[in-house]
Amino acid sequence: MALRHRFRAPAARTSLALALLAALPALADASGAPAAQPSTLDTVVVTASGFEQKITDAPASISVITREDLARRPYMTLLDAVRDLEGVDVGETRDKTGQGTISMRGMGADYTLILVNGRRQNNHGDIYPNNFGGNQFNHIPPLDAIERIEVIRGPMSTLYGADAMGGVINIITRRTLDSWHGSASIARTVETDDAFGDDSTVDFFVTGPLLPGVLNLSARGSWYERKASNPTYAPATDPAGGLHTRPLGFGSGSKTVDNTNKAGGITLAWMPSDNQTLSLDYDTSRQTYDNRIRINDSGVEEYPVGTVDTINSIWRASNYCSGASGANAAACRANGGTWARRADPRVGYSASQAFTRDAWALTHEGQWDIGNSFVSLARVATNNDGRTLPFTVAERERLLAMIDGTGAYAGMALAERRALAESTFLPRPKRTLESAQYTLDAKLDMPFQAAGEHTLVVGTQVIRGDLTDGVFGTEKGTPGLKQEHDMYSLFVEDNWKVSTPLTLTAGLRYDDHKVFGDHLSPRLYGVYALGEQWTIKGGVSTGFKTPKTTDLYDGVIGFGGQGTLPFFGNPDLKPETSTSTELAVYWQHPRGHNFNATLFHNRFEDKIDSQPCGAGLALRCTSSGEYAELGYSSSNRTVNIDEVVIQGAELAGRWQISDAFGLRANYTFTDSEQKSGAEKGLPLGNSARHMANATFDWQASDRLSLFLTAEARSRRYRGVSAVTGKELYYKDYTVLHLGASFEATGWLTFNARINNLLDRDFTTYQTTFTDLNGNGIYGDVTNEVLFEDDYNNKDKARSVWLSMNLRF
């Protein structure tokens, strides 16, 4: 018997939507005004080839998000900017802080390269262990500082190197100006359900000359705040009338804590001549999360993002079978093992979590007779503050003696032993998690004539970085070691206009990594113009991703089970690689209509994953060190395992119905299959197989525009049934948003949007009751009551977003 805990009448939702749509004409002049022109296929981009080109001419699948687009929607993280693009999925998962990730063409977040003005922002190692990875997408420039965002779908390692396997997101900020201008925005999202917390944002940007024509300044800043959310599941009633209350978790479970994200930056631009610019940029970002212990509605202590270190969390011990398998002492000894005992202290988090990033860049841009040059030296330093060190082997052995009252602690009272343990082991030492890297980029694009027009791009990249993780070395009893990351690259790419309609792009990149050696990344792409309205383009691109610095460490690289179970790295890992083929057709009409369709096929090899290791298994835990003494010779270790094929289609277009009305929409089909490894035949990750977005916009008057947006997702993979072995999928859904923008004056604009217009409930679930022992009582035997969520993420209920933008 299955029971859904809540029912919402779809008829009521539909009536509300129709009523709102019917009311729209009353808000505008009957005459209607020309619609604001959206970005078109003629938009100029730079990310696809390293120099300026139209979207239709660019050798890649690329989309552009303009500053005007960003101002019309709620904006807290990078996910808010890209969520409605074809090929982009921001709904795969949520981390412990409730932050999401960005996946492109079925590749996970680790395969998306983030750039700011062409400079890489990705960390070379994992400083967000234990499911905090969404925070990497929060270290972004303030809204008012962004000029546009260019998004490339598909591998781009020829130009950008490692990490660009799934795609590239290049955030391009506003340039300094020789006259004083600026803008400021303030916004708030008000929730209609008080179980969810409100969002507040403030942004500003200002630029102008310090020395006219010689030295310009720009400054930017933002302050984003998100209040805690504490939704609850409705209870389920079993056939006997008993109520079963199910707790919601943090992160993907929709519960979140208070958090703030503050960012600021400054740029100085010196123009010694009309064709030379030297700029110095500094940027800082601070995210904080409240992790204080709290009591939930059931009266139970809970830790929002991780176990806070207390005497109660460390005062734990258990029995285990050493050298064999066995659930109890008799079975263990019968299998030749030794029944033993060990301490299992749960630690790893302080009462506040903070994620910081500081970056600077010195950049020279020059225009020469032979072409244009770009040289940049940048440093990015990221810090995860608020983690604490798990217990070493020696500490665990001493703690066990205190718990059991043995050795030096024999005869001591329990309270005395607990007090001694608290003073000895608490507070825990800080677990340093710091990543820093210097990146030198140099590039020259040179136009020339030779059997047609050419634009040759040549360049180099040098990366020198290091990562410190407090757990490195714990297998030796010396925590706090450092891992280095050194890589050198050369690349060349030629954009050859063979004839008026045909352009070929060929490129090659050579990378030399300190650990695994060299790697070549070629690509070949063609663009053919079938007249003024039609363009066909396609090609083959390659991508590669170096193993994370953390994964390459030969020893303990992290802990699971709240600091109890060590995980191990592997210095013999190979880079992950991919080869992607795509074919696309583009059409544009002088009246503003446009359409594009793309087919893509991506072969992904040497995927890195974590697999069980230990005695009796094919994979040995060769770097467990001292932890083997406590029976941790069986755990998990990183290895290259899988080959995956991902293929699909992307459709996008705009229909300019009239001067006042327009409809733009896109659709993405993604199909993936793992060709090898333990999950052969199954999809990779849980990207939605079908994604669709549509926006109907109406320029009601010169000052007022309105729009209705729909987001649809279906067939999101959730795993395999343990009973039937069949693939399982989350429930399909469609969400509507209704928005408006009103330009009160030439310098003041108001924006508003109703998010989740029909108030879809994402906390619904299915319950299966089975009376296994036949006593008519459900829940007194394991697996008599089983819960299954309808949705992988518990998105918020209906809310109202309001913003005001001031320009000067």
Regions found by a protein language model. Name each.
Residues 47, 79, 83-123:
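Extracytoplasmic beta-strand/coil segments of soluble accessory domains associated
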Residues 121-153, 204:
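Short acidic/polar hinge/loop motifs at secondary-structure boundaries
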Residues 124, 603-605, 712-719, 741-808:
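C-terminal beta-signal and adjacent terminal beta-strands/loops
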Residues 138-185, 807:
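A beta-strand signature from Gram-negative outer-membrane beta-barrel systems
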Residues 185, 497-499, 600-603, 622-721, ...:
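Gram-negative outer-membrane beta-barrel transporters
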Residues 186, 363-365, 374-386, 529, ...:
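Membrane-embedded beta-barrel scaffold of Gram-negative outer-membrane proteins
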Residues 195-292, 321-322, 356-363, 450:
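Transmembrane beta-barrel wall of Gram-negative outer-membrane proteins
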Residues 269-286, 331-516, 529-531, 596-599, ...:
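Face-selective signature of the C-terminal outer-membrane beta-barrel domain
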